[in-house]
């Protein structure tokens, strides 16, 4: 979501990494969405009604979310001028960098907060600025899909911030998130709802 000076999240970038490279598997994305929705609904004890997608790119999560919950409210943010210009109106994508969430509160706290495949590209200073805002805006579960230096992953390594998994765990816990596993984190508002063995 943060763009180094020489890295552009333009049409070519999304085509290369999300279409041509074959990394965008629709069935896999649907399973991921179902996992996140199920976790949030389990802890909220009701269907989700609101989603905030930070670093949403072209809003790939939006269609599978709406297929599961047609009435939910979806709001996406991304730093890509291309994604905002091309899909802003039709997919509810607005401009913002990750660090903007130090002050940006675009909606009431949401049932499901998504920040998928973003945080491992955000420089540490900006990460520390924006992360508390994510905790404040999450009333249910956050899906924070992040790769650490221990991971061998396929995809874009340009701008990858090689930080150990324990670094992320500490940062997420410091703002009140509780680990649930599979990239899901329980919001600070609900941490008392989980038993000791549910929390990772």
What are these regions (language model features)?
Residues 114:
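A conserved beta-strand element that flanks and buttresses the S-adenosyl-L-methionine
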Residues 117-121:
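Short catalytic micro-motifs in class I SAM-dependent methyltransferases
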Residues 1-106, 122-200:
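Class I (Rossmann-like) S-adenosyl-L-methionine-dependent methyltransferase catalytic domain
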């Amino acid at each position: 979501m943060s763009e180094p000076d020489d890295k552009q999240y333009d049409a070519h970038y999304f085509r290369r990494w999300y279409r041509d490279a074959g990394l965008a598997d629709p069935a896999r994305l649907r399973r991921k969405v179902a996992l996140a929705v199920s976790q949030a609904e389990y802890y909220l004890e009701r269907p989700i009604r609101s989603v905030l997608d930070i670093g949403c790119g072209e809003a790939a999560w939006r269609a599978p979310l709406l297929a599961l919950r047609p009435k939910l409210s979806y709001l996406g943010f991304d730093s890509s001028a291309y994604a905002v210009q091309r899909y802003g109106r039709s997919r509810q994508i607005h401009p913002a960098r990750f660090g903007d969430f130090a002050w940006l509160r675009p909606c009431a706290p949401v049932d499901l907060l998504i920040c998928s495949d973003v945080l491992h590209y955000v420089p540490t200073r900006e990460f520390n600025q924006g992360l508390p805002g994510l905790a404040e805006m999450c009333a249910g579960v956050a899906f924070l899909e992040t790769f650490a230096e221990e991971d061998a992953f396929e995809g874009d390594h340009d701008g990858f911030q090689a930080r150990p998994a324990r670094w992320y765990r500490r940062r997420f816990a410091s703002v009140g998130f509780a680990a649930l596993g599979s990239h899901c984190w329980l919001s600070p508002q609900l941490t008392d709802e989980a038993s000791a063995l549910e929390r990772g």
